[in-house]
Design a protein with these regions (language model features):
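Feature captures hydrophobic
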Residues: 1-136
Length: 136
């Protein structure tokens, strides 16, 4: 499945919902998060996850309007998201190193969910995926 495709997003949501550790870590999370891959000469793409108290209520490819309405928006070049999904970089380290930009939402608001964010990307790595041809 192509990363951030309809099928991949649905599979990511299903994997999140099947994981009790994620449910516990995200028990107080309310609101959508959008992850956007942009730069490196690749087409802008991303995913929107609707998270509510440890449950993924839906996930789909992101559209531009999602970046305005989501509680949190994280952007990074495709090569960085690839590192994250392959487990070579945590989202928090990516933000701290300036590789991932918190385009919307406050870092202090996200800090209680570091464990949930780490599990989100770890679980994303369990979804069979291929990366777009224009990703480095």
């Amino acid at each position: 499945m192509l990363v951030f495709s309809v099928d991949w997003c649905a599979a990511w949501c299903a994997v999140l919902n099947a994981d009790s550790a994620f449910a516990e870590a995200a028990a107080t999370w309310e609101g959508a998060i959008v992850v956007v891959a942009d730069g490196d000469g690749a087409a802008r793409t991303g995913a929107r996850l609707d998270l509510h108290r440890g449950v993924c209520r839906g996930a789909r490819p992101a559209v531009p309007a999602d970046e305005r309405t989501a509680r949190y928006v994280l952007t990074a070049p495709p090569a960085v998201w690839k590192e994250v999904m392959e487990g070579r970089l945590t989202p928090l380290m990516g933000v701290m190193l300036g590789k991932i930009r918190l385009a919307k939402g406050g870092l202090m608001d996200l800090l209680p969910y570091v464990g949930a964010a780490k599990l989100m990307v770890e679980l994303a790595g369990r979804v069979p995926a291929t990366f777009p041809a224009d990703w480095p």
